[in-house]
């Protein structure tokens, strides 16, 4: 099974845009096996690091330290602020590793609950990222690798980076905005499926939203988009908070 693979060779042949779209549509669909939201977060981390890579003769390298720093940051507010579960419930009531790591950290230091991830003291943040990298990379790298048949990246658990193929890198740059929106939508659908209704009421309270006409899916989409897009624009560096406000007012934009 790909999910427990220790390494995966990169398919560096030229892949057409149509083939990549077919692969991404599969990954975003319910036909693609998912037990947690990790695949969505990993895709987001890859997209966030497209301009933070090292060219190599085999493609573009993204180091695990950068990849899982974004991975951890993506989950911080979803887990700590909104208390959203990130995997399907088990009979034993176990939560995902990312939830366990963050909940353990906030139990030891409750002050962390009120901080954005970027505001956490550097030593504490570094330790959190190291734990997330050690625990969460075990299966998600192999799982997503397998979904793409090695046509997106190659990896080695004993190494310290993934290698994007040149075809994949160019495709991701070209369609970054579209892929982000599709990723948010699929992520929101998964969150809606694995979180109970009482969590939704908690979210409405947290967001100070009294919008009975909104569907749960729209609310989860708004959370993801507002959390992840109230930041600097990928291309121009300008703050895009206005854009996220638009998506709350007009959910059809996302």
Describe the function of each predicted region.
Residues 2-229, 239:
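Mixed-charge, low-complexity interaction segments
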Residues 231-235:
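C-type cytochrome heme c attachment motif
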Residues 237-254:
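Histidine-centered nuclease catalytic patch
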């Amino acid at each position: 099974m790909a999910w427990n693979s220790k390494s995966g060779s990169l398919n560096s042949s030229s892949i057409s845009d149509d083939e990549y779209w077919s692969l991404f549509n599969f990954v975003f669909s319910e036909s693609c096996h998912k037990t947690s939201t990790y695949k969505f977060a990993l895709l987001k981390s890859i997209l966030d690091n497209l301009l933070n890579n090292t060219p190599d003769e085999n493609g573009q390298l993204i180091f695990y330290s950068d990849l899982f720093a974004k991975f951890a940051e993506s989950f911080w507010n979803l887990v700590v602020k909104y208390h959203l579960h990130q995997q399907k419930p088990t009979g034993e009531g176990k939560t995902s590793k990312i939830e366990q790591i963050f909940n353990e950290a906030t139990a030891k230091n409750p002050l962390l609950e009120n901080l954005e991830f970027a505001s956490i003291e550097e030593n504490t943040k570094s330790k959190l990222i190291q734990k997330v990298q050690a625990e969460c990379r075990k299966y998600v790298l192999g799982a997503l690798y397998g979904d793409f048949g090695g046509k997106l990246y190659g990896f080695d658990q004993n190494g310290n980076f993934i290698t994007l193929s040149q075809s994949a890198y160019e495709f991701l740059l070209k369609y970054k905005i579209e892929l982000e929106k599709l990723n948010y939508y699929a992520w929101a659908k998964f969150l809606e499926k694995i979180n109970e209704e009482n969590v939704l009421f908690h979210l409405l309270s947290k967001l100070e939203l009294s919008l009975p006409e909104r569907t749960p899916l729209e609310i989860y989409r708004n959370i993801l988009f507002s959390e992840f897009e109230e930041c600097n624009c990928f291309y121009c560096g300008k703050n895009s908070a206005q854009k996220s406000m638009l998506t709350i007012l007009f959910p059809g934009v996302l």
